[in-house]
UniProtKB/Swiss-Prot annotation:
SMART domains: PUA (SM00359). Keywords: Amino-acid biosynthesis, ATP-binding, Cytoplasm, Kinase, Nucleotide-binding, Proline biosynthesis, Transferase. NCBIfam families: proB. One of its GO terms (cellular component) is cytosol. Pfam families: AA_kinase (PF00696), PUA (PF01472). InterPro entries: AceGlu_kinase-like_sf (IPR036393), Asp/Glu/Uridylate_kinase (IPR001048), G5K_ProB (IPR041739), Glu/AcGlu_kinase (IPR001057), Glu_5kinase (IPR011529), Glu_5kinase/COase_Synthase (IPR005715), Glutamate_5-kinase_CS (IPR019797), PUA (IPR002478). Its EC number is 2.7.2.11. GO terms for molecular function: ATP binding; glutamate 5-kinase activity; RNA binding. Belongs to the glutamate 5-kinase family. Its main location: cytoplasm. This is Glutamate 5-kinase. Pathway: Amino-acid biosynthesis; L-proline biosynthesis; L-glutamate 5-semialdehyde from L-glutamate: step 1/2. GO terms for biological process: L-proline biosynthetic process.
Length: 367
């Protein structure tokens, strides 16, 4: 492990609180110690931290608040400053500075903002500063939220050009069944491809303390692995889990990266949360999946959501299954007008055209 590597460590609420109502500072100190040890060895560390709402609730003395988005954003606004202060305080013990980055989905959807976020993150790393990343919960609405820090950590790993992504949770890894209810469940140590059977095993279990369950961790692993990043799910309370994961020792479930990772532009397409979606017919589905063709307006059946030209959208077949993500050549209003029409009719219908395809194959990632 002598060569410098970049590791993204995602710490969920259940890890930071130990299942309690307050931040477990003693455990966070230990996690920081492990990160500082790797930092001293020349490795680059990125922290994706949950816990802003928990920190805000603790700081305000556990107030009785209505279960509304405004209440959560209030707690996040109070807690985020406390959280970053804690990370700075603990890393400073080892002479390490931290830099806060608060992101939303909009930072990933727009190519220019994506590149700006990437440059900021890499500048922090180049100057031996540990980036501490969280979603901007105090201002993010449902429309611009990534939604959970598992998927945010995968996007952060792509931005950082990471070698590994470590998702720390209250479980030792992915099991063949829920170990809390099935004593026969076995730990899955290695995964070389994520399929529907594995997604069914992961289910949608949530600890109740955060927004992510094993299902979202699988989504994050899928995104990261396709971008060439090994991903590990492991227990946050396992001794020296961060150092052992970095050294390649077995610590949980390892999702092995694709041997041929996506090039940079397609990493952005794959990582950006879709701004909308379109449903295509059987002919278009076959052309995309079997021939790698571009999507023509003729094959579009339904356009859902409101999105601009140049934004990433989800492409689904008539059964509702995701088949691809891609950059739309037209906005949602225009696509609704030309859906089901031949490409030669685009100019007559819209009064302009940006070419004969709705999504070009060079701007598309097959799911």
């Amino acid at each position: 492990m002598s060569e410098s590597q970049t590791l993204v460590v995602k710490l969920g609420t259940s890890v930071l609180t130990g299942g309690s109502r307050r931040l477990n500072r003693a455990h966070i100190v230990e996690l920081v110690r492990q990160c500082a040890q790797l930092h001293a060895m020349g490795h680059r560390i990125v922290i994706v931290t949950s816990g802003a709402i928990a920190a805000g609730r603790e700081h305000l003395g556990y107030p009785e608040l209505p279960a509304t988005i405004a209440s959560k954003q209030l707690l996040a606004a109070v807690g985020q400053s406390r959280l970053i202060q804690l990370w700075e305080q603990l890393f400073s013990i080892y002479g390490i500075h931290v830099g806060q980055m608060l992101l939303t989905r909009a930072d990933m959807e727009d190519r220019e903002r994506f590149l700006n976020a990437r440059d900021t993150l890499r500048a922090l790393l180049d100057n031996s500063i540990v980036p501490v990343i969280n979603e901007n919960d105090a201002v993010a609405t449902a429309e611009i939220k990534v939604g959970d820090n598992d998927n945010l950590s995968a996007l952060a790993a792509i931005l950082a050009g990471a070698d590994k992504l470590l998702l720390l949770t209250d479980q030792p890894g992915l099991f063949t069944a829920d170990p809390r209810s099935n004593p026969q469940a076995e730990l899955i140590k290695d995964v070389y491809g994520i399929d529907d059977a594995l997604r069914a095993i992961a289910g949608d279990s949530v600890s109740g303390l955060g927004t992510g369950g094993m299902g979202t961790k699988l989504q994050a692993a899928d995104v990261a692995c396709r971008a060439g990043i090994d991903t590990i799910i492991a227990a946050g309370n396992r001794p020296d889990v961060i150092g052992h994961a970095m050294a390649g020792l077995p610590v949980g479930t390892c999702f092995h990266a694709q041997e041929s990772p996506l090039e940079n532009r397609k990493r952005w397409i794959f990582g950006a949360p879709p701004a909308g979606e379109i449903t295509v017919d059987a002919g278009a589905t076959q052309a995309i999946l079997e021939r790698g063709s571009s999507l023509l307006p003729k094959g579009i059946k339904i356009v859902s959501g409101n999105f601009s030209r140049g934004e990433v959208i989800r492409i689904r077949n008539s059964e509702g299954r995701d088949i691809a993500h891609g950059v739309s050549r037209y906005n949602s209003d225009a696509l609704r007008l030309i859906a089901g029409q031949h490409s030669q009719q685009i100019d007559a219908i819209l009064g302009y055209e940006y070419g004969p395809v709705a999504v070009h194959r060079d701007d598309m990632i097959i799911r």
